[in-house]
Swiss-Prot record:
GO molecular function, one term: metal ion binding
Enzymatic reactions: ATP-dependent cleavage of peptide bonds with broad specificity
PANTHER family: ATP-DEPENDENT PROTEASE SUBUNIT HSLV, METALLOPROTEASE TLDD
Protein name: ATP-dependent protease subunit HslV
Assigned protein family: Belongs to the peptidase T1B family. HslV subfamily.
Uppermost EC category: hydrolase
Gene Ontology biological process terms from the UniProt entry: proteolysis involved in protein catabolic process
Subcellular location: Cytoplasm
Residues where Na(+) binds: A168, C171, T174
Name of the gene encoding the protein in the UniProt record: hslV
UniProt xrefs under HAMAP family: HslV (MF_00248)
Keywords of this entry: Allosteric enzyme, Cytoplasm, Hydrolase, Metal-binding, Protease, Sodium, Threonine protease
Lineage: Bacteria, Pseudomonadati, Pseudomonadota, Alphaproteobacteria, Hyphomicrobiales
Length: 186
């Protein structure tokens, strides 16, 4: 994700993929963090559990910004327990209107057993038409691969692993060090 200050190197850093299939929802993310043309870290953890394990989420963008947003989402999930959509809408409203938050540069994919959502600082709270959604510099590669695989025999986790492997082979800002979280879906 590009920084707003043109004097700083561009930050590119990830592929996050969500697949919902066969009673499971899986979010996977790679571990590469790049600053400009340099790989800074290869094993970052960009996918995690929230709300005592009831929600999984992954982020693309500036790491500190994403952690801030995860903390805010965690607070909203405590305020609206079991209501991921409501918590996300409330977070996004704050993200758009708060002077500090609106500067944050990140996107998030979050899911619980019922719904998966994409959140952005532009005010987006989007649910995918299909069971697949991706963000980040390699997101379109992973999304294309997952859509091609979703009608086959592979389960959700296998689709995530295969699609992320394909994205890592194409996108220079994505690597094969995966963190994957899974939930049983409704």
């Amino acid at each position: 994700m590009a920084q707003t200050d043109d004097r700083l190197p561009q930050m590119h850093a990830t592929t996050i993929l969500m697949v919902r299939k066969g009673g499971r929802v899986v979010i996977g993310g790679d571990g590469q963090v790049s600053l400009g043309q340099t790989i800074v870290k290869g094993n970052a953890r960009k996918v995690r559990r929230l709300a005592k394990g009831a929600v999984i989420g992954g982020f693309a963008g500036a790491t500190a910004d994403a952690f801030t947003l995860f903390e805010r989402l965690e607070a909203k999930l405590e305020q609206y327990p079991g209501q991921l959509s409501r918590a996300c809408v409330e977070l996004t409203k704050d993200w758009r209107t708060d002077r500090y938050l609106r500067r944050l540069e990140a996107m998030m994919l979050v899911a619980d057993k019922e719904v998966g959502l994409l959140l952005s600082g532009a005010g987006d709270v989007l649910e995918p038409e299909t069971g697949v959604m991706a963000i980040g510099s390699g997101g379109n590669y992973a999304l294309s691969a997952a859509r091609a695989l979703e009608d086959g025999e592979l389960d959700a986790e296998a689709i995530v692993r295969r699609s992320m492997k394909i994205a890592a082979e194409i996108c220079v800002y994505t690597n094969g060090n995966l963190v994957i979280e899974t939930l049983d879906a409704a």
